[in-house]
Amino acid sequence: MSKRRVVVGMSGGVDSSVTAWLLKEQGYDVVGLFMKNWEDDDDGEYCSTRQDWIDVVSVADLIGIDVEAVNFAAEYKDRVFAEFLREYSAGRTPNPDVLCNAEIKFKAFLDHAMSLDAEMIATGHYARVRERDGRFELLKAFDHTKDQSYFLHRLNQAQLSKTMFPLGEMPKTKVREIAAQIGLPNAKKKDSTGICFIGERPFRDFLNRYLPTKPGPMKTPDGKRVGEHIGLAFYTFGQRKGIGLGGSKDGSGEPWFVAAKDIPSNTLYVVQGHDHPWLLSHELVAGNVSWVAGEPPADGFACGAKTRYRQADAACRFGAAAAGPAGEARFTLAFDDAQWAVTPGQSAVLYDGEICLGGGIIEHAASGRDAAAAAPAAALVEAR
């Protein structure tokens, strides 16, 4: 009887390497697939693609599996990077890793794996898949400190039915331990951080290559001008560092935070104090929705939600919202407690305990700024 073939997405990191080894040990016919999703700067100081491929080949040789590389750079630019630039141009703060998982790692990659006669795919993500009553559920990882279900919330039933997450049941410390025990050449390689196509380079420098700077006024909620920004795209809601107002002589002495963007007037609004009303929200509206089960929760459903990665689940109630301009579905979340710096463009992801239900892209978060005359909510960036 032939072995079941599993194609493993291998990045050169320790997680995907241990994933491949575990599946090989379990008797699967394992094939490694290295995805190249970015073409520019292959020889630049911030690009690790070449070394990552060397690490993948070394690991494959050690554990005895075949490996190949596939170039998804064109698909990535069309499906992920173009949207990334559109969102930043509109003043929002997108999360490209969420879209990359849905469009590249679990779509383009999955399709390619099936062309290699694979039955399943596997990655080194920290999450779990469970089949129950004929449906597939996306669950948080056993190690909640490494859980990545937030980034995977847009996966659908077809994708989950073909996906394995072998690391979902173990802590990261165990993964490192296995890597050392079997002598993986990348056992001590540090975890990747930041957006995949930016790597370790300064984010503002990277963004400046693709989006023009457009300086404008920086004002307080009462309309007082306190400085000048370099372009709304280069700031995000709740940002503290890099504003350039550290010791403003007219301030209260508390740190400054980005609180809103007014696109028509090209104005950046800033406030002082971590708990300023403009930074706190009890409700949000999200669009571009995606549900793991294929349908939304019931109206009024009590659940938990994350509005950023590694945030603790915040108690809230789900509600249906008026459809968007093109008739697209939207939803609201009403939080029990005020949430800090809920950022348009980021994902609001819903949970029922350990089960990830899905979510959507935050369009607007109601806060103290909505009642302020200096920056009417209708003109703020989150209004689409």
Swiss-Prot record:
The keyword Cytoplasm applies. It comes from the Bacteria. GO terms for biological process: tRNA wobble position uridine thiolation. Keywords: ATP-binding, Cytoplasm, Disulfide bond, Nucleotide-binding, RNA-binding, Transferase, tRNA processing, tRNA-binding. Pfam families: tRNA_Me_trans (PF03054), tRNA_Me_trans_C (PF20258), tRNA_Me_trans_M (PF20259). It is found in: Cytoplasm. It is an enzyme of class 2 (transferase). InterPro entries: MnmA-like, MnmA-like_C, MnmA-like_central, MnmA-like_central_sf, Rossmann-like_a/b/a_fold. Residues 146-148, 308-309 are annotated as: Interaction with tRNA. The keyword Disulfide bond applies. ATP binds at residues 9-16, 35, 124. One of its GO terms (cellular component) is cytoplasm. The active site is at 100 (nucleophile), 196 (cysteine persulfide intermediate). Its EC number is 2.8.1.13. Disulfide bonds join 100-196. The record marks 125, 346 as: Interaction with tRNA. Catalyzes the 2-thiolation of uridine at the wobble position (U34) of tRNA, leading to the formation of s(2)U34. This is tRNA-specific 2-thiouridylase MnmA. It comes from Burkholderia vietnamiensis (strain G4 / LMG 22486) (Burkholderia cepacia (strain R1808)). The gene is mnmA.
